[in-house]
Amino acid sequence: MQHYGVNGYSLHAMNSLSAMYNLHQQAAQQAQHAPDYRPSVHALTLAERLAGCTFQDIILEARYGSQHRKQRRSRTAFTAQQLEALEKTFQKTHYPDVVMRERLAMCTNLPEARVQVWFKNRRAKFRKKQRSLQKEQLQKQKEAEGSHGEGKVEAPASDTQLETEQPPGLPSGDPPAELQLSLSEQSASESAPEDQLDREEDSRAEEPKAEKSPGSESKVPGCKRGSPKADSPGSLAITPAAPGGGLLGPSHSYSSSPLSLFRLQEQFRQHMAATNNLMHYSSFEVGGPAPAAAAAAAAAVPYLGVNMAPLSSLHCQSYYQSLSAAAAAHQGVWGSPLLPAPPTGLAPASAALNSKTTSIENLRLRAKQHAASLGLDTLPN
């Protein structure tokens, strides 16, 4: 059971006469001990207390004392003159300092606290009005943009229809990397035989009145027309070197179609006929009494080992081994037209050049020309 203290007595005791008598006696004793002391609310009789307040007020007063009720303030009613003075000050500044508020309070006959609260409420009202104006402006802008956007939507719609009806052509951007790589490989493979032909033509131009036969010319365009196909079954995967010496990235073949044994033999036979005619022309024009010119022509022939890799490192090793064996078998036929028998009385240096060295030089020249006709580029050592 809860007890609500009233000077040490419970509320239930107030219902009895003895409780009221004790309260009255206690109040009388306090008044006697302190004559100048005002008697408290508890010293009043129950009839006096009930006459001025309700039972709920008695309970609240017993619980919290006589000052339990919150003092309520009535709403301040500003006059027209007070509102005019306050509005003029608000137009000058929204945050008046203490001095300005005190002067305004003296002019309007209002407490300074009321002036301060009025400015606080006035600032809140001003911010609310500003927000409403901003919302209205945004709404108007959206409506204006919507009206303009409706007119613009029709024009882009027709443009998109034209774009969809137009067939998709080649992409305007850069070509794919695979296409660029294949084009670069093809250009490199086509430029390599051309550079080889230029070097051969320069070396042949140094020889007196050397002519190129039509048989050897007919081989090279066929090789240049072929595009590199790395996935062809019979092609030879060789990484050619550019004239500057840099190796290409992916390995690709030098021929577009597989090289059959019959085709190799036919090309070699035609090419040998062309080179034999060339050698015969040079030997006839040099003549018998001038073997030194023939030796110079043989010396002018480029050495195969300078620009070509060893035959053992090539993929067509067996073919070149058979080629060298055939060249050794026909050593006398190939070596006789280039250098005739030197007459007696020549210098010892020209006599020391025997037929074996001449056959090796001829073999290197023919192997190099045959590789150029097939489109095989030179490889560094």
UniProtKB/Swiss-Prot annotation:
Which key words are in the record?
Answer: Developmental protein, DNA-binding, Homeobox, Nucleus, Repressor, Transcription, Transcription regulation
What are the Low complexity biased-composition ranges?
Answer: 177-191
Question: Where along the sequence lies the DNA-binding region?
Answer: 71-130
Q: Where is this region: Interaction with OTX2 and is required for repressor activity?
A: 1-156
Motif OAR at which residues? 358-371
A GO biological-process term: negative regulation of transcription by RNA polymerase II
Q: In which tissues is it expressed?
A: Expressed in adult brain, stomach, and testis. Expressed in the developing diencephalon, midbrain and hindbrain. During limb development, expressed in a temporal pattern with expression being first restricted to the forelimbs and then subsequently to the hindlimbs.
Record field: compositional bias (Basic and acidic residues): 133-153, 201-214
**Compartments where located:** Nucleus
Task: List cellular component terms (GO).
Answer: nucleus; transcription regulator complex
Q: Name one GO molecular function term.
A: DNA binding
Span-the-membrane segments of this chain are: none
State what this protein does.
Functions as a transcriptional repressor. May repress OTX2-mediated transactivation by forming a heterodimer with OTX2 on the P3C (5'-TAATCCGATTA-3') sequence. Required for brain development, neonatal survival, postnatal growth, and nursing ability.
Concerning its family, UniProt says: Belongs to the paired homeobox family.
Q: State whether it acts alone or in a complex, and with which partners, per the record.
A: Homodimer or heterodimer. Forms heterodimers with OTX2.
Q: What is this protein called?
A: Diencephalon/mesencephalon homeobox protein 1
User: Origin organism of this chain?
Assistant: Mus musculus
